[in-house]
């Protein structure tokens, strides 16, 4: 009996303790729930505020002057390439031009080999320098005609048929720093030799350097199951190499005649048709609107050409301050500051109107130079109605428009050194004047 009584008391005590503990636990649980609910509410509110602030920041950060482009005409082109650390824009832009020509005519897409062209062209250029006893320039640069000459005389191969060797320093991009540091002194040593006669053995040595750094040009190769020589492959592309002409516009030679544009990289000295500026411009418009592209060579050293994919013929004297602040006088800004100001000003930037007289003045005083080669393939306009050429670059998928530049018509007309185009893209009335 006593045993059972003690047990009942113990049970009663345990029951009361259990109830007390349960009540305490319930209170703790409720308090925890309240705290968790409050924390969630605070986090949600904080998140909403952060989103609101982010949206506001984004809204504030949008530049109302940023160009918004509407395409007027866009012709098919091949993929964006990267010339990297090599002075081969002339090569990339012109091969890109011929790839677009093939695409237009045959609907086939090709990736033609730039280093095949370099290999052949640098050997030819070295031979000329030696023949001139060193009184000729030997450099990485070139002209659109160099590519056409190689296609006509040596042929071409697709990129896959000529693998690049050790020149790339472990990656897939061109790096001509070491290459030319080796090759230029070699060519100079032969060209400026004091010997009465020289042998042709030096060509074998130079060819070894070219092959080591650029890759060896194949004598034959297979492409899509068929064996070709480079000449046979070039013939199979469906183009007539005699269809291509070069156009320029200067007053120190008669209009509607040909002359070799006097720049150092035009070392083969081909003739370019000299036209009045307005007709030079009309050919570009006519070409693009009729499905053709244009291999353009010109000056991109101006502050109106940005690395973000925009080029405008800015009025530097008239644009003293793009913000209206006396602190930022345009002519005193650094190149980087000018680029930033241009980006900020966008479509509000005032442009100059190009003229024949200004083109000639800048050519004669070295302001207009042959800096770069690119491919014009389309026409677009911004929200103000200003028209631009759509231009493919060879600096990889860089800038605001992933390797494409929007270059105002005024900029292109003013800064053109010369360009290559299919003669069938020239308006009939101009062709008649040229007799082609």
Specify the residue positions occupied by each region the protein language model found.
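Short regulatory "switch" loops immediately downstream of catalytic or recognition motifs
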Residues: 1, 104, 379-380
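Bacterial Sec-dependent N-terminal signal peptides
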Residues: 1-16, 20-53
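Surface-exposed, flexible loop/turn segments at secondary-structure boundaries
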Residues: 43, 97, 302
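Cleaved targeting-peptide boundary
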Residues: 51-61
